[in-house]
A protein has these predicted regions:
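Bacterial N-terminal signal peptides
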Residues: 16-28
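OB-fold and OB-like single-stranded nucleic-acid-recognition modules
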Residues: 31-134
Length: 134
């Protein structure tokens, strides 16, 4: 094997080893870039992102047909800039979310949609919610 072939082989081997590390680093950077404030959520409608803020108000509509649980962030309803909504059919996975998450700093991941001109994420799995500081 001549020197040029050896250098070429070493270059290819190094690139193969480096590629997974570069891809992992890029994925971490993109994940961090998707973390947004509750006030910025309105600018990311129809996008999947992680929205972070403090739950200052909650409401469980146990008498309604859909039995929604609402987690209102940063300001009490109706002034909350962002809401996480847990549908009734998923509620059992969360225990009592209106008590568990009240006054907690959370990050919620999912597709941001608009309802009544306000951004929200429909939360169907506990893995979509992370308590900050844990």
């Amino acid at each position: 094997m001549d020197i040029e072939s050896t250098i070429g082989w070493i270059t290819i081997a190094a690139m193969r080893l480096a590629f997974p590390l570069i891809a992992l680093s890029l994925a971490c950077l993109l994940a961090a870039a998707d973390k947004i404030s509750t006030s910025a959520a309105k600018d990311h409608l129809e996008q999947t992102a992680t929205v972070c803020g403090k739950v200052v108000g909650t409401r469980y509509l146990d008498q309604s047909a859909n039995k929604f649980t609402f987690l209102n962030f940063d300001k009490p309803y109706p002034d909350s800039p962002f809401t996480a909504v847990i549908p009734g059919e998923n509620r059992a996975k969360f225990g009592e979310p209106e008590k568990t998450y009240l006054e907690k700093n959370l990050c919620v991941t999912g597709k941001i949609v608009e309802y009544n001109k306000k951004p929200e994420i429909i939360v169907t799995e506990p893995s979509q919610i992370k308590v900050e500081g844990k």
